[in-house]
């Protein structure tokens, strides 16, 4: 929004032309979202506490979690507000990638909001029924996939890129829609499953989001893309603003979500952030790299799938409890140790993902 104002003023005052620089707007996007989170966070936490919008804790969960009962939740709404405001202020709102990504993020956040509202405010322990949650995730995920496919102008926009191999690609055709659907919906649910400990989900989300910003910037720059043998995708650079806002909002939220948490993000945050990472990974054609960098999310999801499958087929459990972070808690690991070690794993995996830019 402010880009338009700056463009107009630049006709009369040349200093405003600096706002045409993507890097400056990205920095401002990070700082804007960070400040919104830090300034609004305490007010939101007080309001959530006043209206008793607190986390319900499972009776069959780790005993160490019983003390978390009543901790304010639905704090993910703060993240979404910070991202939306910062993006609307600093991004080019004529860019289709920005609009699609922001739209998907807010729509998945709406699903999470309804689920949280039913659980916390209406005191319905089931929240939004799983079939309806998955239905709306499918509607929005499939809708985004079709929209990206129909608006694709270049062959590389629907081509699967294989990491570490510059000459191995796969033209997906309509298969792009199916892959996009699974990446968006899968990413959404994976982050949601990971969000079980204080700060466990938000920091990997910030790290993966920051890495995807690097891919978005380089893919949108013709010379860098050619040099690194990655697809040149005009317009993806503008996603750096959105991802910068995500990073800033996430860091601001972590200020209050770090152990011991003052607030939880809830489904409104987790579902939205996972979908955001997924849709960006698709746009910059780095789905497989996203799978690597988001390895913690993948591990958490696979642990649940294996646990359920094993119990149904054999009557036995593979893990003491799923998702995986609960397994380590029940093995005696203190919560901060689980969190930090999962962060360390994410740092390593993100570096591996970034290494694919050069190792081809």
Curated annotation (Swiss-Prot):
The keyword Cell division applies. Its EC number is 2.7.8.13. One of its GO terms (molecular function) is UDP-N-acetylmuramoyl-L-alanyl-D-glutamyl-meso-2,6-diaminopimelyl-D-alanyl-D-alanine:undecaprenyl-phosphate transferase activity. The keyword Cell cycle applies. It catalyses: UDP-N-acetyl-alpha-D-muramoyl-L-alanyl-gamma-D-glutamyl-meso-2,6-diaminopimeloyl-D-alanyl-D-alanine + di-trans,octa-cis-undecaprenyl phosphate = di-trans,octa-cis-undecaprenyl diphospho-N-acetyl-alpha-D-muramoyl-L-alanyl-D-glutamyl-meso-2,6-diaminopimeloyl-D-alanyl-D-alanine + UMP. It comes from the Bacteria. Disulfide bonds: none annotated. It is a multi-pass membrane protein. The chain crosses the membrane at residues 2-22, 26-46, 73-93, 97-117, 134-154, 168-188, 199-219, 236-256, 263-283, 288-308, 339-359. Pfam families: Glycos_transf_4 (PF00953), MraY_sig1 (PF10555). This is Phospho-N-acetylmuramoyl-pentapeptide-transferase. The gene is mraY.
């Amino acid at each position: 929004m402010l880009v338009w104002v700056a463009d107009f003023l630049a006709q009369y005052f040349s200093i405003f032309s600096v706002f045409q620089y993507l890097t400056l707007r990205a920095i401002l996007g990070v700082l804007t979202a960070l400040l919104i989170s830090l300034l609004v966070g305490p007010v939101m936490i007080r309001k959530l506490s006043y209206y008793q919008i607190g986390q319900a804790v499972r009776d069959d969960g780790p005993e160490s979690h019983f003390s978390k009962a009543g901790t304010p939740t639905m704090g993910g709404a703060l993240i979404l507000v910070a991202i939306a405001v910062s993006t609307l202020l600093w991004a080019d709102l004529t860019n289709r990638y920005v609009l699609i990504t922001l739209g998907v993020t807010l729509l998945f956040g709406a699903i999470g909001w309804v689920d949280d509202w039913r659980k916390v405010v209406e005191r319905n322990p089931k929240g939004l029924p799983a079939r309806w949650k998955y239905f709306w995730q499918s509607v929005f995920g499939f809708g985004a996939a079709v929209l990206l496919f129909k608006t694709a102008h270049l062959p590389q926009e629907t081509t699967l890129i294989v990491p570490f191999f510059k000459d191995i690609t796969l033209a997906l055709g309509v298969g792009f829609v199916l892959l996009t659907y699974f990446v968006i919906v899968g990413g959404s649910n994976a982050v949601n499953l990971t969000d079980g400990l204080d700060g466990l989900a938000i920091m990997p989300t910030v790290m993966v989001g920051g890495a995807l910003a690097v891919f978005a910037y380089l893919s949108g720059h013709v010379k860098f893309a050619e040099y690194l043998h990655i697809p040149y995708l005009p317009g993806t650079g503008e996603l750096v603003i959105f991802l910068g806002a995500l990073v800033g909002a996430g860091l601001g939220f972590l200020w209050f979500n770090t152990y011991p948490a003052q607030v939880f993000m809830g489904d409104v945050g987790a579902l939205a952030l996972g979908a955001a990472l997924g849709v960006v990974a698709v746009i910059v054609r780095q789905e497989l790299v996203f799978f690597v960098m988001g390895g913690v999310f993948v591990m958490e999801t696979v642990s649940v799938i294996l646990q359920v499958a094993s119990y149904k087929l054999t009557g036995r459990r593979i893990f003491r409890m799923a998702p995986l972070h609960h397994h380590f808690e029940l093995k005696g690991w203190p919560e901060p140790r689980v969190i930090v070690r999962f962060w360390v794993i994410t740092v390593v995996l993100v570096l591996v993902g970034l290494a694919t830019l050069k190792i081809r």
